[in-house]
């Protein structure tokens, strides 16, 4: 990956050093159009030897050091939060019966106290990386635990977590401690020394690939047509655009098209000197918005920290030069960097040029091979076909960010006793701490295998496991993603072969989305609709809740037969026909046509509607009494409407209690919405303080256990209770959400089936 012209050159003082030692200037390069545009001449890449010399050109270390410091700081902040140190005991509690999803089944978590030690090593490595203290060792101390934790749980994989591991891997081989580091204070050889150009080239190439491949993946028809993030435009951040655009056009033009153009162009805008200021403005605005739109941890800030890598490497020195002199004494050096053995210096023809050594050739080879590998991996799914589902590959290294949104309407897990034939149902997600397994065949296979090991403890022998999972991707019909007739315990799965029990995504039905949106918009606010598509030969068994007093099914395409189980009646529906479904009963919908059937459930939650009407009446009555238009005195059971709480007297009705709880909740939301900035900031900081406080205390407890042994259970319980305290938060504040908020204690497997109403 090349660098821009200004980025490739050293600062003025550094140029002087090179001229004194090498006896040549870069005047010719400055005069060449290619040199000005790309930072190198064609002759610099005309042979392997010249390319090695180019990639090892001495470059100012200042910008690289600033990125090292900021990236290390982001990782220090990330470990207690998104890496899960604050909730580690909930995820890896010893003896917890839970199904896990590592990349390799042989990869298992260590005992809890040892997991805290792993995280401690990772934290110290990130801290050492940030400070540039024993830099190479610190990078390794961070890198190895990070990838161990990352590979331990596929359900937590995402693009930015993968990117962190890549950046740490790159920094391990770089000389990022040659400026603004503790190592530089301890070693004169490392203090303010040149770094080879490939250090910048690899990082810039990585960030360029992230932007550009993300843009290429957004050329998907769903993104271009505005289906991927359809509801994102409702966020308050897009309010300014709605002064001139409708919400639909804001979603299409601003969210989707502008997002596509930004990803495709960001790398180029940052690369070239003439457009860099515009690129910095756009990507900074983009990542600041993302920090508010999504819960993606440190990712926006890491990307913000990476943007200055595209600027001239000496920009920190220029910044320091504009600071007050007293402050300059505390800031990094402004003097020109000293020569380094890691670089190749050009000399005069009389003296002969410096010949690149093995380390220089290895650095150049690493740069080329690494960037080629990063360009290949997002399109390598033809090799790992077992991980392909409706989208290609495990979510992470493909850079297909936000392209696919899913909704799950119905999930049913059925088990059959292999000896007795007895059928039973499991709560979806039992024995798990994540929901991502529903979309990935490899995780489903791991989940079924785990359940087959756990169910014999509950008197289910030789269990067979069947999954009926309905998913809608990017506003399509809800449809099955896996064949519900296949026992996943015995089903074959290979990482290198297509999954035979994966159902195809019904792409032929995608044009229906416009019609489906028209149907939705034609319904009133109290009517809900769910669109279903099913395969020939399969049927859907569903239960209509008693709360849904007005439920009907209407056929859109194909032919279905509806069986009312309790009444033992069948009715066949042709296209356009509909029928009423009784509440509180099961029914089955069989697809009879040779092609997939499409139908929709239309229903009204009559119980919820009646409650809303009653609450609206109480609100109206309260307002009438307060403004004096209601002359009749309120009965005693309704007095809490005026007081806002129960103060003696008769017990209010459940309806009044529900009204009071809603009023209190609305008042709290309004109070928070109108809270001054300093109050919001304080609440945010206190929640973060709790996360770091709990992380620190639980780590101390575990390290003590490893060194001195575990105390009594009573003492441990007291220590954990103390770690869970929130002494800094005001009374009544809700608990902050943890990294993993799922229930660590799964339900019993013989619980009643959970039926999701359509």
From Swiss-Prot:
PANTHER family linked to this entry: VITAMIN K-DEPENDENT GAMMA-CARBOXYLASE
Protein family: Belongs to the vitamin K-dependent gamma-carboxylase family.
Location of N-acetylalanine modifications: 2
Bias (Basic and acidic residues) ranges: 12-22
Segments on the Lumenal face: 82-113, 158-292, 383-758
Cytoplasmic compartment residues: 2-60, 135-136, 314-361
Protein name as annotated: Vitamin K-dependent gamma-carboxylase
Protein's cellular compartments: Endoplasmic reticulum membrane
GO cellular component, one term: endoplasmic reticulum lumen
Phylogenetic classification of the source organism: Eukaryota, Metazoa, Chordata, Craniata, Vertebrata
GO biological processes: negative regulation of bone development; negative regulation of neurotransmitter secretion; negative regulation of testosterone biosynthetic process; protein maturation; vitamin K metabolic process
Organism: Delphinapterus leucas (Beluga whale)
Note in the entry: The vitamin K-dependent protein substrates of carboxylase have usually a propeptide that binds to a high-affinity site on the carboxylase. CO(2), O(2) and reduced vitamin K are cosubstrates.
């Amino acid at each position: 990956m090349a660098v821009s012209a200004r980025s490739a050159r050293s600062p003025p003082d550094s140029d002087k050093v090179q001229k004194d030692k090498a006896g040549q200037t870069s005047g010719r390069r400055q005069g060449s159009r290619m040199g000005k545009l790309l930072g190198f001449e064609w002759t610099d890449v005309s042979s392997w030897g010249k390319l090695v010399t180019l990639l090892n050109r001495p470059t100012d270390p200042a910008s690289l050091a600033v990125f090292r410091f900021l990236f290390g700081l982001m990782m220090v902040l990330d470990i207690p939060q998104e890496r899960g140190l604050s909730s580690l005991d909930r995820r890896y509690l010893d003896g917890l019966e839970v199904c896990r999803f590592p990349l390799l089944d042989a990869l298992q978590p260590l005992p809890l106290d040892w997991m805290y030690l792993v995280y401690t090593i990772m934290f110290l490595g990130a801290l050492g990386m940030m400070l540039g203290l024993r830099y190479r060792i610190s990078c390794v101390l961070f890198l190895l635990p990070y990838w161990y934790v990352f590979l331990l749980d596929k359900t937590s994989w995402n693009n930015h977590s993968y990117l962190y591991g890549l950046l740490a891997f790159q920094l391990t081989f770089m000389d990022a401690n040659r400026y603004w580091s503790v190592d530089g204070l301890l070693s004169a050889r490392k203090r303010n020394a040149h770094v080879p150009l490939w250090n910048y080239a690899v990082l810039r190439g990585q960030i360029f690939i992230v932007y550009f491949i993300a843009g290429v993946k957004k050329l998907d028809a769903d993104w271009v047509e505005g289906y991927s993030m359809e509801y994102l435009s409702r966020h308050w951040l897009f309010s300014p655009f709605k002064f001139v655009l409708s919400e639909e056009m804001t979603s299409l033009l601003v969210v989707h098209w502008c997002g596509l153009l930004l990803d495709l162009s960001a790398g180029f805008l940052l690369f070239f000197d003439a457009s860099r200021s515009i690129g910095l403005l756009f990507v900074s605005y983009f990542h600041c918005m993302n920090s508010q739109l999504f819960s993606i941890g440190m990712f926006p800030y890491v990307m913000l920290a990476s943007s200055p890598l595209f600027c001239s490497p000496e920009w920190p020195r220029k910044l320091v030069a504009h600071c007050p002199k007293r402050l300059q004494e505390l800031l990094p050096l402004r003097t020109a960097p000293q020569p380094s053995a890691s670089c190749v210096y050009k000399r005069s023809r009389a003296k002969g040029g410096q010949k690149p050594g093995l380390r220089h050739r290895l650095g150049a080879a690493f740069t080329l091979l690494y960037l080629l590998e990063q360009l290949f991996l997002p399109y390598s799914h033809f090799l790992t076909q077992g991980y392909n589902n409706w989208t290609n590959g495990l979510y992470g290294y493909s850079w297909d960010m936000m392209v696919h949104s899913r909704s799950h309407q119905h999930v049913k897990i059925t088990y059959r006793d292999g000896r007795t034939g007895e059928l039973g149902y499991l709560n979806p997600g039992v024995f798990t701490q994540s929901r991502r397994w529903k979309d990935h065949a490899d995780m489903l296979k791991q989940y079924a295998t785990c359940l087959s090991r756990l169910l014999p403890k509950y008197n289910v022998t030789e269990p067979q496991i069947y999954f009926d999972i309905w998913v809608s991707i990017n506003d399509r019909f809800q449809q099955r993603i896996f064949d519900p007739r296949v026992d996943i315990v015995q089903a074959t799965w290979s990482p290198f072969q297509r999954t035979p029990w994966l159902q195809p995504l019904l792409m032929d039905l995608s044009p229906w989305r416009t019609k489906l949106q028209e149907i939705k918009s034609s319904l009133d606010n109290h009517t809900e609709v769910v669109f279903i598509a099913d395969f020939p030969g399969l049927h859907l068994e569903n239960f209509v809740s008693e709360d849904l007093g007005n439920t009907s099914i209407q056929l859109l395409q194909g032919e279905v037969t509806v069986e009312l189980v309790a009444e033992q009646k069948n009715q066949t529906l042709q296209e356009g026909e509909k029928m009423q479904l009784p509440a509180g009963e099961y029914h089955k919908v069989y697809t009879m046509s040779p092609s997939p059937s499409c139908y929709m459930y239309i229903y009204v939650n009559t119980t919820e509607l009646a409650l809303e009407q009653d609450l609206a009446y109480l609100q109206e009555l309260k307002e009438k009494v307060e403004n004096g238009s209601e002359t009749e005195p309120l009965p005693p059971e309704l007095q809490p409407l005026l007081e806002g709480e129960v103060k003696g007297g008769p017990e209010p009705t459940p309806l009044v209690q529900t009204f009071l709880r809603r009023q209190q909740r609305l008042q709290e939301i309004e109070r928070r919405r109108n809270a001054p900035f300093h109050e919001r900031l304080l609440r945010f900081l206190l929640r973060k303080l709790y996360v770091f406080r709990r992380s620190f205390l639980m780590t101390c407890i575990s390290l003590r256990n490893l060194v001195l042994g575990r105390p009594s259970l009573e003492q441990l319980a007291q220590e954990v209770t103390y770690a869970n305290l929130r002494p800094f938060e005001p009374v009544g504040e809700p608990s902050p959400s943890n990294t993993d908020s799922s229930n660590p204690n799964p339900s019993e497997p013989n619980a009643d089936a959970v039926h999701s109403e359509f």
